[in-house]
UniProtKB/Swiss-Prot annotation:
Name of the protein in question: Bradykinin-potentiating and C-type natriuretic peptides
Outcome after substituting residue 40 to A: Important decrease in ability to enhance AsS activity
PTM annotation (Pyrrolidone carboxylic acid): residues: 31, 44-45, 48, 64, 68, 85, 103, 117, 123
Lineage: Eukaryota, Metazoa, Chordata, Craniata, Vertebrata
GO BP annotations listed: blood vessel diameter maintenance; cGMP biosynthetic process; negative regulation of protein kinase activity; receptor guanylyl cyclase signaling pathway; regulation of blood pressure; vasodilation
Family designation: In the N-terminal section; belongs to the bradykinin-potentiating peptide family.
Subcellular location(s) per record: Secreted; Cytoplasm, Cytosol
Comment field (misc): Negative results: does not bind to type-1 angiotensin-2 receptor (AGTR1). Bradykinin-potentiating peptide 10c-F is present only in female snakes.
Biological source species: Bothrops jararaca
PANTHER family from the UniProt entry: C-TYPE NATRIURETIC PEPTIDE
């Protein structure tokens, strides 16, 4: 009786095995088989005690050279210290903009463009020329003084200006300087004026030397006329084929 029960159970197992081989339950079991529990790489490093440092895994060249250069100084360089502390070597002092931003201050105002930089100094420092001035060291002012006469050079105001300033119709007496002071003040202007007495005398001697020679001269031309008369008396004026020599030829002997 026991043997019959064992045989029946064996047949049942064979039937179930045949059904499992032909059906899908075996494929699902094979696919859902749990694999080995492999932890991630970081977990493995942490378990082995080699947790990665936050800095670079390969030390910089400065650190390698310092480690290989034995005996090295007692205090390592700043780059080696930063790498040993787990910090990447960076600039020790931040830029000025970063410092201002960290302190809550706004950075410097932007630099103005080049045209504005060129325009601002000219408007600020360029000298303003007066209407009567010119860059050529006051030549226009000298011409105005010459055209106005010795009164403008000596600084004496005119009668019309006095009337306009006072508002009265009566002509004001012109302010006169003493004879010596007035002569000293007006002498430079008098010498520069083209219509002065000395200029007229020089021009008369050059343009009318025949008249001065015949009539004896007038004003400043008397000396030249007397000299020509003396030369004519000596016969020096008749040395060019009986023709009268001009003044230049007489004085220099260059010809008729």
């Amino acid at each position: 009786m026991v043997l019959s029960r064992l045989a029946a159970s064996g047949l049942l197992l064979l039937a179930l095995l045949a059904l499992s081989v032909d059906g899908k339950p075996v494929q699902q079991w094979a696919q859902s088989w749990p694999g080995p529990n492999i932890p991630p790489l970081k977990v493995q490093q942490w378990a082995q005690g080699g947790w990665p440092r936050p800095g670079p895994e390969i030390p910089p060249l400065t650190v390698q050279q310092w480690a290989q250069n034995w005996p090295h100084p007692q205090i390592p360089p700043l780059t080696v210290q930063q790498w040993a502390q787990g910090r990447a070597p960076g600039p020790p002092i931040p830029p000025l903009t970063v410092q201002q931003w960290a302190q809550g201050r706004a950075p410097h105002p932007p630099i103005p463009p080049a045209p504005l930089q060129k325009w601002a100094p000219l408007q600020k420092w360029a000298p303003l020329l007066q209407p009567h001035e010119s860059p050529a060291s006051g030549t226009t002012a000298l011409r105005e003084e010459l055209s106005l006469g010795p009164e403008a050079a000596s600084g004496v105001p005119s009668a019309g200006a006095e009337v306009g300033r006072s508002g009265s119709k009566a002509p004001a007496a012109p302010h006169r300087l003493s004879k010596s002071k007035g002569a000293a003040a007006t002498r430079p202007m008098r010498d520069l004026r083209p219509d002065g007495k000395q200029a007229r005398q020089n021009w008369g001697r050059m343009a009318h030397h025949d008249h001065h020679a015949a009539a004896g001269g007038g004003g400043g031309g008397g000396g030249g006329a007397r000299r020509l008369k003396g030369l004519a008396k000596k016969g020096a004026a008749k040395g060019c084929f009986g023709l009268k020599l001009d003044r230049i030829g007489t004085m220099s002997g260059l010809g008729c």
